[in-house]
Amino acid sequence: MNNQCGTSPIVGFRFTLSPMTSDFVSVIKGALNETDLQNVWRHTDDVSTVIRGRSEHVFDVAKAVLSHATKTGTHVSMSGTFSVGCPGDTMGDNLLDVTSEPANGKVATQYVSSQFALYPLGDLNYMDIIYEEIDFAKARGVFNESMHYASGIHGDIEPVFSFYEATFDRVRAKTSHVVMTVTFSVNSPSHEGRHDA
């Protein structure tokens, strides 16, 4: 076990995929099977799926899984936690010695609404860091709204995930232990066919 924050290069993402359909099992399994997982370590149990590896591959896989799950038009929610530098983490169950080229790459255009909360753990200036990333989202054109306990991010799936990966890596460069919770909603009836911010 690693007892010091920030010494592990492993990024993890534990998520739950929730398709709003009675055929949810095939949607979840189909999304995982259609996603190229060769650059991450993955384990699925009865509650969630965890993927571990290098940052670029973890975000690439997360985006691909969500994209595959939503391509039929089914309303899908994905909720999860990205983490790096946890002092309780282990060096096992990971793939780090792999190519830097993402295995899945760009996905089809898809409007995504999401909410995130950022936790630069152990940093006394954590609020300054959080405000910087909210301003970063506004500059990227993906900021939706402020809300209790989270910030809204929306737009096409590519710039939305590009923002999340960039902001996670930006905070990671400043703070040794970073946690980011995100909930995505795609194909919601309330989106009215939107494709961008």
Residue map of PLM features:
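Charge-rich, low-complexity N-terminal segments
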Residues: 1-197
